[in-house]
A protein has these predicted regions:
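C-terminal alpha-helical interaction module
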Residues: 1-319
Length: 319
């Protein structure tokens, strides 16, 4: 049994492994009106953290589909309060809550369930009409934006193409279990065995993705789909945070020629770069996770030229 202090004790198993809590609120906005949440411009509001990879997915999809005027968004303070969780405020890159005047995101959770005792997480899709959370599932929010909000989108992008949906789901699950959540399973492990098991799985999958990207510009061909963005949010944080802070240090993403070129390629797609805030990312992880980093010192690096030429245009081909 592990006796080491866990970052989130309720999500820690006796063998030292971290097992993430399930999303608590999973209602759906439907274009066909089959739920209490129809697609209406201006009705829904997205609460996010620029530090959080799960929230970052929804920010990117909202941006790529041109939903900014249809779905409002408010960013929380990257430094999560130890007692109350995510906090609104006035600072660089974050702001007060303009919808409800909440001080803490917990207040949104309390509006749905005053007895909720789980961890307060982002993203949150809020319904301004019923004054309730529709969803705190990044998976579902992404998919709603992709499939239900199409009438409000001003950009012709298909991030969930029908011919690849089965393959997308399979690769999504692999990337989630071994990379997206895998870095957390390594970083939040409280036993050597649990850490090594998770860390090796991270690099097994990164190695496989490096090979896959040798002859394919994106994971499914010439155009990026939702799986690429699910992977991107971990890759963009990897060398700055997960390599050192979470001890996933066999290799950096910069050491993978294909993955690093792919990362730069995605980063350079119009609209994506401004969704990335390394100040928020580093301050959140290194300051908030004081069980891992008790000094709360935030590192100054790494230096990454994400705007450098990537050369991956040569791999473009028809999907």
């Amino acid at each position: 049994m592990s006796t080491v202090q866990a970052q989130f004790p309720d999500e820690q198993h006796d063998d030292g492994s971290f097992v993430r809590q399930q999303d608590a609120f999973r209602d759906w906005v439907r274009a066909d009106g089959s739920t209490p949440y129809p697609v209406v411009a201006g009705r829904y509001h997205l609460y996010v953290s620029l530090a959080c990879p799960w929230a970052h997915r929804t920010i990117i999809v909202r941006e790529l589909l041109g939903l900014q005027s249809a779905v409002g968004m408010t960013v929380v303070n990257p430094i999560r309060d130890d007692e109350h969780g995510w906090e609104f405020g006035d600072g660089p890159g974050f702001s007060p809550d303009p919808i409800n005047g909440f001080r803490y995101l917990r207040e949104a959770y309390d509006a749905n369930d005053p007895h909720y005792r789980g961890r307060i997480t982002v993203p949150v899709l809020w319904d301004t009409q019923s004054e309730r959370i529709v969803s705190n599932s990044d998976d579902d929010i992404m998919r709603m934006f992709e499939t239900e909000f199409t009438a409000l989108s001003n950009r012709a992008r298909d991030l969930y193409p029908a011919p690849f949906r089965d393959e997308i789901e399979r690769l999504n699950e692999t990337i989630y279990a071994t990379v997206n959540d895998g870095v957390y399973r390594a970083g939040f492990a409280t036993s050597q065995a649990a850490y090594e098991r998770a860390a090796y799985r991270v690099f097994d999958t990164l190695d496989a993705l490096e090979a896959r990207l040798a002859d394919s510009r994106y994971l499914f061909g010439a155009l990026p789909v939702e799986t690429d963005w699910r992977l991107f949010v971990t890759l963009i944080r990897f060398d700055a945070v997960y390599f050192g802070h979470f001890k996933c240090n066999l290799r950096r993403i910069a050491d993978y020629p294909n993955l690093f070129g792919y990362l730069r390629d995605l980063y350079q797609i119009p609209g994506v770069a401004h969704t990335v805030n390394f100040d928020h990312i580093k301050r959140h992880y290194y300051y908030t996770h004081d069980d891992i980093n008790p000094t709360r010192i935030v590192p100054i690096g790494p230096l990454q030229d994400l705007g450098a030429p990537h050369g991956r245009e040569r791999l473009s081909r028809s999907v």
